From Swiss-Prot:
Start and end residues of each N-acetyltransferase domain: 62-217
Top-level taxon of origin: Eukaryota
Protein name per its UniProtKB record: N-acetyltransferase 8
Topology in membrane: Single-pass type II membrane protein
Gene Ontology MF term list: L-cysteine-S-conjugate N-acetyltransferase activity; L-lysine N-acetyltransferase activity, acting on acetyl phosphate as donor; N-acetyltransferase activity; protein-lysine-acetyltransferase activity
Length: 222
């Protein structure tokens, strides 16, 4: 098992960070596709449309061709939310990581480095409108290279954010992750995060039934 250390993001890390983040998000597309195929409305579409064509035209060949056209469309539909999310991030906070995360004492961005390579990332920003009496920090961009998973890197990165939050006087750490990101969901539960709700990012994520899970980690008061 290769050793790693966690440090603050530096500008020279940018290309590696963005590349790892983008690839990590797009890795979820096959899972999203399988999830979409098992939805009742998808099964109805895959069975109903070809059957309707057979009843209207009497051609089974046309029905088979229809299925072959529907499957690439469903792949596109499953992948689009992830691609849209990556594009949005690269045009907002990830466009300038230093400006977004390192221009204020109450925020931060860290990388895990191993053998001179960036193998993990995590960021944190203060919540703009927290509940009354709370000071909350939101965890963002947790990602670990596929070749370095299972080594405790993600857990170490989350602990870095939790310790930073304690040092800065935050009352809670909050985050949002996708239902299909089961590795992340399991990690957060195992570290003591509590689920506070679910939501959908937009109509497309609702259509493909990819919900977002909201978590909170209350920090003990000093």
């Amino acid at each position: 098992m290769a050793s790693f250390h966690i440090r603050q993001f530096q500008e020279r890390d940018y290309e590696q960070v963005v590349d790892m983040f983008s690839r990590g998000m797009k890795e979820h597309i096959p899972t999203a596709f399988r999830h979409l195929l098992l939805l009742p409305r998808t099964l109805l579409l895959l069975l109903g449309v070809p059957l309707a064509l057979v009843l209207v035209s009497g051609s089974w060949l046309l029905a088979v061709v229809c299925i072959f056209f529907l499957l690439p469309f469903l792949w596109f539909l499953a992948g689009q939310p992830w691609k849209n999310y990556v594009s949005k991030c690269l045009h907002t906070d990830m466009a300038d990581i230093t400006k977004s995360y390192l221009s204020d004492r109450g925020s931060g961005f860290w990388v895990a480095e191993s053998g001179g390579q960036i193998v993990g990332t995590v960021g944190a920003l203060p919540v703009k409108d927290p509940p009354s009496g709370r000071k909350q920090l939101q965890l963002f961009r947790l990602s670990v290279s596929s070749q370095h998973r299972g080594q405790g890197i993600a857990k170490a990165l989350v602990r870095t954010v939790l310790q930073f939050a304690r040092d800065q006087g935050y009352t809670d750490v909050v985050l949002v992750t996708g239902l299909l990101q089961q590795g992340a969901v399991t990690l957060y539960y195992s570290m003591g995060f509590q689920k506070t709700g679910e939501s959908f990012m937009d109509i497309l994520t609702w259509l493909v039934d990819v919900s977002l899970i909201h978590f909170i980690y209350p920090l003990p008061s000093s």
